[in-house]
Amino acid sequence: MEVRERTKSNGKETTIVKLAIDTAAGGSFQFRAAEKQGYFEKNGIKAQLSNFAYGIDTVNAVLTEQADTGLAADYALLNSLGKGDMVVISTLTRGNEKSSKDNELLVKEEIKTENDLKGKKLGVPKGTVTEYVWAKYLAAKHINEKDITFVPYSTPDEAIVGMKNGDIDAIWSSGALKDKFKNIKGVTKLGDLESAGVTIDSYLLAKRSFVEKNPKVVENTLKALSEGVKYVDNNKKETAKLAFEQLKLPEKDALKDIERQNYVLGFTEEDAKHLEDMKVWLEEKGKLKDKYELKDKINLEALKKAFPESVTYK
């Protein structure tokens, strides 16, 4: 049963799909490329892209019916899956050595070693994977969370101001944004995600009802995204130009972001284990408000139809 609104485009019928994407981590370039190159239209999809600051904001857009699909890094995803009837329909990025090394711990000049973090104010964008990163990093360095203060912020600009005026002493940053922090007097690198023993993956999610009522639409959306991924991989400079057009990101900075992203489509046993391990940690820390089974929140039917070989999760 297809319930989507349909429109005629160049005499061809297309289905409107509202895709919420982020402007922060990697900038959702595979979505932007798929739209710009006409891949959605080719697959019968009239994509309406809407920009949000972080993945968590796209999840809220799905929960409040502003969007059909959203995307989120593992941590925000797990915290959100119990809030509404949403399902994971594919992995979008997998953390690798390159992306882990790119995500750096930047600190004020008086912090020379991990131990100097004690008594300091650590910046954390609320509800994002950085909460997990800090916890893992501090545990790895044997620093008690009681000995530090977390300072929440909601946008990178807020964090930059915080670092400048002394409200924040240390922060995690990656990609193009990193240079903005490094340009602040006395800010240096102390470590990276690899030293925290953490990888960050991100996922595509949607309302369960949308997925169940529109299987073909979801399948075609995934096909268009796959072409978007291939385009970005093979046309990094052109994608960087697109980033400048749409996000006003300087091309050389966007290029850095694109080079470190490991865009994928698929869902493997490893993807599921990554989420399950993090979910257990959240439960043990008492951070997961809603009870649910991960397996009930995964719907890979469309992905299996579009790219059967990309799914190894049973």
For the regions a protein language model found, what residue spans apply to each?
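Small-molecule pocket liners
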Residues: 94, 99-105, 187, 200-204, ...
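Pocket-lining segment of extracytoplasmic ligand-binding domains
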Residues: 75, 150, 157-245
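Sec-dependent N-terminal signal peptides of Gram-positive bacterial secreted proteins and lipoproteins
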Residues: 1-2
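Secondary-structure end/capping motifs
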Residues: 212-289
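Conserved C-terminal helix/tail region of periplasmic/extracytoplasmic solute-binding proteins
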Residues: 283-314
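Solvent-exposed, polar/charged alpha-helical surfaces in well-ordered, non-transmembrane soluble domains
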Residues: 29-32, 37-38, 60, 64, ...
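Short acidic capping loops at alpha-helix termini that bridge into adjacent secondary structure
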Residues: 115, 145-149, 252
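Short, glycine-/small- and polar/acidic-enriched structural segments
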Residues: 5-144, 169, 175, 198
